[in-house]
Amino acid sequence: MRYDRRFCFRSLETPAMQVLVDADACPAVIKDMLFRAARRAEICVTLVANQFLRTPPSPFIKAVQVPAGFDVADARIVELAEPGDLVITADIPLAAAVLDKGAHALDPRGNWFSRENIEERLSTRAMMDQLRSAGIDTGGPAPFSARDGKTFASQLDRFLARHAPR
């Protein structure tokens, strides 16, 4: 399935990819980069969240609000994802699900999820969950940094140079 870039809706006539964003936990600076990229490359960026999201006016940017609930936004992203799409998420199981559909997955720090690394990431996540369940403090991720933002921007630009419509 494809979409009409003018209206950010898929159609059979216009080949293109879209960017889907797991927006509940996505840093604002990353959303801003995606908004600029949507206008520049004329690609559809769809933010999915269980809360209202304010987005800039653009035919290339839309927000989808889903009901609150465990993994409801993730399920909607998997439903919307098509082969070749880009999904922005830090959620490892969501990344695995969209990779299974033939989409690409990039985390907000600029790290790619791939068929080669997803099993290891899922195993590490499961191990950390077990440690937390046993009462062990595993800490959390480092705070989002300017370097993370630059890495993400670089990876996004490279991806769009190869995959965005011209």
Model-derived features with residue positions:
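Nuclease catalytic cores that cleave nucleic-acid phosphodiester bonds
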Residues: 9-166
